[in-house]
């Protein structure tokens, strides 16, 4: 019993070791399986530019992307891709596909992107795309499709982008796009469409961009685009459109771009653009327009860009409404509008001709909708004037056409500017208050947190002021008008004369180098007495006046020691200017 159990356990252990290894080898082999002449990158298979006439074999069932571009495939058979149920995108462009079986795409329900452009497809069955309801992007451009079936796109509720460009389509069936509720982009350009049924685009509630250029339309009525509430751009250039009318009972407020260039438009019906209040970009170049009515330019209230070159402008009084509108227009515009008539001004610029020949000098043209102000706020809904908000001296909206447009102003603009200025003043005051409060807070915190530092700063500033005052006082004391110095340095011979005769010459050097002689006795201190100041000051650096003669005193009255002959003596006398002048003599014996 135990032996059997051990044997079974050994067998199970061998199985547990070998099974994962075998599974890993199988998975690795499956991942490495790649068709001949193809390149595999994980779950993406590239079989491009190898002249494949059919779908290659041995493509892994777990592939999520398959590119068969630039090959020689001529036909898509039934269940051609049934084994590729994980496929997310499939590229079949630039082949020679002329027929597609209605069950060709069975089994690839997860497919989100299908590219069939640049082939030779002339017909598609009504149910061709029903097996792929998760499509987001479908490209059928550059084929030879002549018609679309009524249920061609039924069930494609997740479709976002649809390319039908450059085919041979002549009509668009009624409600053919009914189920394409999320369609954002539709390209029908470069076909042979001559007319549109009223409900051709019914159901495209989220459509934002529509291309209809290079077709064969002869007239356009905006009523053919019912309830396209989100459409922002429509391209109708290079058709054969001769007239444009509106016929809408609703306002098409979402449309921002309208391209009508390269057509045969000779005139625009009055009121055509009234249903497009938010139109920002309008292309009317390369048509046959001779003039634009006043009612038409009045409806261009939100334009920020316009092209008008290449038309047959008649430079007469009928051009004046457009001329004045362009003169006040602040957006992007062309300056190459050329006169086609009258004969004598053919080839001249419209603006130059009007000003040179005074064509509009006696014509009063107005703009009731203020289109020249629209570029300042292109994204906002247009301002519709109401008589109730006008100033007392303003005219009603219905009679606005009486006054010229250059002087027109929006009511309430001054008040808006006043509010803006008031807000700026408040903001500036608040900013100033916060700045001062911040400075005071920093000072207070510094004073509280570092009191010693604040005291040192105060002491430093006080010492600085004291030093400054001391320097000023010293500068005043050292002025040349404050003190005078008189030096006396007798020579040896003069000393002998003084000793023998009792008198002799002496030299007083005062600023200005003035000299005088005074009698000098051997004992100088007792000999000086005066009733009035000895020195009289007239002006600064004036000659020194001696007011008192020197009188000798008897030897008996002198108790001071006498000078000895034969010795060198020097006397220095200093005279200082003070309230009571006095003369001091200091004797120095060398």
Curated annotation (Swiss-Prot):
User: Where is the LRRNT domain positioned along the sequence?
Assistant: 31-61
The LRR repeats are at: 62-83, 86-107, 110-131, 134-155, 158-179, 182-203, 206-226, 230-251, 254-275, 278-299
**GO BP terms, alphabetized:** AMPA glutamate receptor clustering; neurotransmitter-gated ion channel clustering; positive regulation of synapse assembly; regulation of presynaptic membrane organization; regulation of synapse assembly; synapse organization
Hey, what's the signal peptide range on this chain? 1-30
Domain called LRRCT: residue spans:
311-362
Listed under GO cellular component are: AMPA glutamate receptor complex; GABA-ergic synapse; glutamatergic synapse; membrane; photoreceptor ribbon synapse; postsynaptic membrane; synapse
Note the InterPro entries from the entry.
Leu-rich_rpt, Leu-rich_rpt_typical-subtyp, LRR_dom_sf, LRR_TM_domain-containing
What keywords is this UniProt entry annotated with? Cell membrane, Glycoprotein, Leucine-rich repeat, Membrane, Postsynaptic cell membrane, Repeat, Signal, Synapse, Transmembrane, Transmembrane helix
A GO MF annotation of the entry reads:
heparan sulfate proteoglycan binding
> What Pfam families would the database entry show?
LRR_8
Q: How does it assemble?
A: Peripherally associated with AMPAR complex. AMPAR complex consists of an inner core made of 4 pore-forming GluA/GRIA proteins (GRIA1, GRIA2, GRIA3 and GRIA4) and 4 major auxiliary subunits arranged in a twofold symmetry. One of the two pairs of distinct binding sites is occupied either by CNIH2, CNIH3 or CACNG2, CACNG3. The other harbors CACNG2, CACNG3, CACNG4, CACNG8 or GSG1L. This inner core of AMPAR complex is complemented by outer core constituents binding directly to the GluA/GRIA proteins at sites distinct from the interaction sites of the inner core constituents.
Tell me the protein family, please.
Belongs to the LRRTM family.
Tell me, in a sentence or two, what this protein's role is: May play a role in the development and maintenance of the vertebrate nervous system. Exhibits strong synaptogenic activity, restricted to excitatory presynaptic differentiation.
What is the protein's name according to its record?
Answer: Leucine-rich repeat transmembrane neuronal protein 4
What's the encoding gene here? Lrrtm4
